[in-house]
Amino acid sequence: MIARIQFIKGIDEKVLPDVRLTRSRDGSTGTATFLFKNANLINKSLALNGEITGMYMIDEEGILETRDVSARFVNGKPQAVESIYIMKSPEAWDRFMRFMERYGESNGLAFTKA
């Protein structure tokens, strides 16, 4: 199964995000901030296909989801979609990193430390 991201269930997001990760010093919690510039779901015709209820990260292990999704507007027009995924345990961090490894392999993304 190919790792993928959806905002509308059943419709894969084709735009690749910029992802920023932060983690607490003790490793117990972390945050992933996704920024999708000109995301598919901004397209009005696609938005008519369903309701945006969150961001769903789907792979062979299952689904990770967040409801923290917002749009960025410039001059009254949507330009980007931002989503924040919070990991509340080391196990959740490890699961997220496994998803991102699969998503990166599927889409030619690379991980670089700041």
Swiss-Prot record:
Keyword terms: Chloroplast, Membrane, Photosynthesis, Photosystem II, Plastid, Thylakoid
Pfam families per UniProt: Psb28
Signal peptide: none
PANTHER family: PHOTOSYSTEM II REACTION CENTER PSB28 PROTEIN, CHLOROPLASTIC, PTHR34963
Domain of life: Eukaryota
Entry-linked HAMAP family: PSII_Psb28
Annotated disulfide bonds: none
GO biological process, one term: photosynthesis
Subunit structure: Part of the photosystem II complex.
Subcellular locations according to the entry: Plastid, Chloroplast thylakoid membrane
Lipid bilayer topology: Peripheral membrane protein
Record-level GO cellular component terms: chloroplast thylakoid membrane; photosystem II
Family assignment from sequence similarity: Belongs to the Psb28 family.
Full protein name: Photosystem II reaction center Psb28 protein
